From Swiss-Prot:
Gene: kynA
Recorded family membership: Belongs to the tryptophan 2,3-dioxygenase family.
GO MF terms held by the record: heme binding; metal ion binding; tryptophan 2,3-dioxygenase activity
Known cofactor(s): heme
The name this protein goes by in its record: Tryptophan 2,3-dioxygenase
Record-listed substrate binding positions: 77-81, 139, 143, 280
UniProt EC number: 1.13.11.11
Subunit comment: Homotetramer.
Length: 308
């Protein structure tokens, strides 16, 4: 209780603290409110400097959605795929950085970049949850406006597949109408994949890798090689002696595991929305995507688990 005649507001009865002053009597703190210096001293005038939107080129990004149908749900479809392309751009950037690091025998930076790619793929997996809010009826209303465009025509996704070792010369054809893009995709097809460079790393570390595995036709998909598996077997049996290679192996398994999850969610989302209809690009749709689930990117790393 307050003493008689004491009109001061009471503080906490247990701490003996003074009560806060009423708002209209609160002391002024410079820069704590809107004024000439801005809100909490934040800069508000960007007429002569770069703003957040300027730095991110938001005008270009946010003006890149152009629905062709009158259907409300097409905006979701467009943004889902555009954001996926942005994440794939970052995944390619990180993978190529990791590849350069492996070539230079700088493995710790490569581990960081590979871990980031795995997290990017997790982000892409979660993105399917947003697209799956589209019902079959909603997709059917906008599908005629898509023409023959299809996700398998994504030149960034194709480069990602090639960089991870799933090579297919036929997949150049969808980009023949764009010579600049075709050149990018072809260069990735004809270069060693990330795993090819890791196998070369094994050879540099003294493991006897077959010469035909080290110098092969890079445009062809990888096949299981006994000498590569034997090298990984030694690494897994004696991880303390080959710690960097052991960590590299596990980073690659993490990466392929995340990629498999992305593929699986792709299949289930397609089945949920269009069932087993033919894809807009002419593929069989869900059956084609299910077949892709059987693709193994780093075969020796999976088979060695049985051998151990």
């Amino acid at each position: 209780m307050k003493p008689p005649g004491d009109n001061a507001p009471a503080g906490c009865p247990f701490s003996g603290a003074r009560a806060a002053q009423p708002a209209h009597e609160a002391p002024h703190v410079p820069g704590d409110a809107a004024g000439e210096t801005g809100w909490h001293d934040a800069q508000l005038d960007f007429s002569k400097s770069m703003s957040y939107g300027d730095y991110l080129s938001l005008n270009s990004i946010l003006d890149a959605q152009h629905p062709l149908s009158p259907d409300h749900n097409e905006m979701l479809f467009i943004i889902q795929h555009q954001t996926s392309e942005l994440w794939m751009k970052l995944a390619l950037f990180e993978l190529r950085g990791a590849l350069d690091a492996v070539r230079g025998d700088a493995l710790p930076p490569a581990f960081k970049m590979l871990a980031r790619v795995s997290r990017i793929l997790e982000q892409l997996v979660q993105a399917w949850n947003v697209l799956s809010t589209m019902t079959p009826s909603e997709y059917s209303a906008m599908r005629p406006y898509l023409g023959q465009s299809s996700g398998f025509q994504s030149y960034q996704y194709r480069q990602l597949e090639f960089l991870l070792g799933n090579k297919n010369v036929q997949m150049l054809q969808p980009h023949a109408h764009r010579p600049d893009i075709l050149e990018q995709v072809r260069a990735t097809l004809e270069a060693p994949s990330f795993y090819d460079e890791v196998v070369r790393l094994l050879a540099r570390r003294g493991f006897p890798i077959a010469s035909e595995r080290l110098e092969r036709d890079w445009t062809q998909p990888m096949r299981h090689d006994e000498t590569v598996e034997a090298a990984w077997l030694e690494v897994y049996r004696h991880p303390q002696q080959h710690w960097e290679l052991y960590e590299m192996a596990e980073e690659l398994v993490d990466l392929e595991d995340a990629f498999r999850q992305w593929r699986f969610r792709h299949v289930t989302t397609v089945e949920r929305i269009i069932g087993f209809k033919q894809g807009t690009g002419g593929t069989s749709g869900a059956p084609y995507l299910r077949k892709m689930l059987d693709v193994v990117l780093f075969p020796e790393l999976w088979h060695v688990r049985t051998t151990l």
